[in-house]
Amino acid sequence: MNNLNDPPNWNIRPNSRADGGDGSRWNYALLVPMLGLAAFRWIWSRESQKEVEKEREAYRRRTAAFQQDLEAKYHAMISENRRAVAQLSLELEKEQNRTASYREALISQGRKLVEEKKLLEQERAQVMQEKRQVQPLRSAYLSCLQREENWQRRARLLLKEFEAVLTERQNIYCSLFLPRSKRLEIEKSLLVRASVDPVAADLEMAAGLTDIFQHDTYCGDVWNTNKRQNGRLMWLYLKYWELVVELKKFKRVEEAILEK
């Protein structure tokens, strides 16, 4: 601890106490600051160490809290993702099942349509075959129907003529002034025509006329001027003959078709 460049009194000597000079004062004067500096350094180091430990502990706590927060968020995110994945898996399974059901329904519907198409084609082929078979019969039916409709028109015209004559005959029968001979002449004329006319003969009108002449005695009141209000049986026969005409038309057509 001696500085060779300094004067002797500035150096600390071990034996300065033996000289009885001011060396001790210098020693104490230098020792006190050094001790204060050492104490300050020790205190400062201790406080610094405490601050460092305190900051380190705070940092550790913050780090631990941050890590726990991250772990909690991570686990929450994992749980949420798992729930989302489970939900999506369930929805996907439902969609797959629904798609499978639709596919099966479409396949079944397609098979059904194919079967219906086959049946329709078979029915169409059968109808076409029946049409080819029926076509000649249809032509024959239309031809016979046309012929019988012509006959029906002639029969209706004949019935209209007989209706007019029978109405006149019944009017004479109910009249108090017209001669009986005129009525008998009309009756005779009607019977002759019913016998010689082929349509009237086919309807067997002669027997009906005879029945009318013998039994139709109905007349309107004395002041009646409407000839159509006289007679009852004659109107029934006229209606009956109209029905016979219609019936005979279809029976003749049927017989003609069956003969072919």
UniProtKB/Swiss-Prot annotation:
Keywords: Coiled coil. The keyword Coiled coil applies. Residues 49-135 form a coiled coil. One of its GO terms (cellular component) is mitochondrion. Signal peptide: none annotated. PANTHER family: COILED-COIL DOMAIN-CONTAINING PROTEIN 127 (PTHR31958:SF2). This is Coiled-coil domain-containing protein 127. It comes from Homo sapiens (Human).
